[in-house]
């Protein structure tokens, strides 16, 4: 019995030599929902998987000032609120500076180790030299999913011509969908309200939980 996506917490010698820890990839995997203990020899009852498990998400806010405590993060909590209302389980939130290396590391960890279904970032999608979110997102992608970012730009242009200035990306890494949202709470709300009704189906297809979305 081991946790889903178990990580190496000590940067062990094996990882340093091979670049990858040797972790179980088969067997009984579990996620801790409530604290407790399990011991060798304990009897374990396996329950059947849920027919319609909730989608799991993570939210990353990118802000130099926010990471230094100079600005309150309002967009991240708003995204969590909207995702929760839509039925997602938000498993992690974090506030990072506008640093590509740190963002790429977290995107890889959340997609590969935590295996969340959806990662939403907020901030860092404009023209400032420190706006590196799209580049970091593309760098970790396996496949592009441009329609989501294009839909957000289309919707934003119906509100303000400045919508054309968004460089937001939407990609897939493995079975995880990663979408860049704007930085301002107002723009976050407008964009997320627009894409959320259709987003879940795409997330479920990527996760292997739904079939394709062809129209009859």
Task: Set out the residue ranges of the language-model regions.
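Solvent-exposed alpha-helices and their adjacent loops that cap or buttress functional pockets
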Residues: 20-23, 38, 50-52, 112, ...
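Proline/glycine-rich low-complexity loops and linkers
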Residues: 133-216
């Amino acid at each position: 019995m081991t946790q889903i996506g178990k990580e190496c917490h000590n940067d062990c010698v094996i990882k340093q030599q091979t670049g990858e820890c040797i972790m179980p990839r088969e067997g009984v995997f579990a996620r801790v929902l409530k604290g407790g203990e399990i011991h060798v020899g304990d009897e374990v009852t396996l329950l059947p998987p849920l027919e319609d498990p909730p989608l799991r998400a993570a939210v990353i806010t990118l802000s130099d000032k926010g990471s230094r405590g100079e600005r309150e993060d309002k967009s991240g909590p708003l995204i969590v609120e909207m995702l929760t209302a839509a039925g997602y389980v938000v498993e992690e939130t974090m506030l990072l500076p506008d640093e590509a290396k740190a963002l790429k590391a977290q995107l890889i960890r959340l997609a590969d180790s935590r295996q969340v279904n959806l990662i939403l970032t907020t901030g860092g999608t404009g023209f400032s030299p420190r706006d590196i979110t799209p580049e970091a997102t593309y760098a970790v992608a396996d496949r592009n999913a441009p329609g989501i970012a294009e839909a957000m730009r289309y919707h934003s242009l119906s509100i303000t011509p400045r919508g054309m200035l968004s460089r937001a990306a939407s990609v897939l890494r493995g079975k995880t969908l990663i979408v860049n949202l704007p930085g301002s709470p107002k723009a976050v709300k407008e964009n997320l309200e627009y894409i959320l009704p259709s987003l879940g189906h795409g997330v479920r297809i990527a996760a292997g939980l739904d079939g394709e979305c062809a129209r009859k």
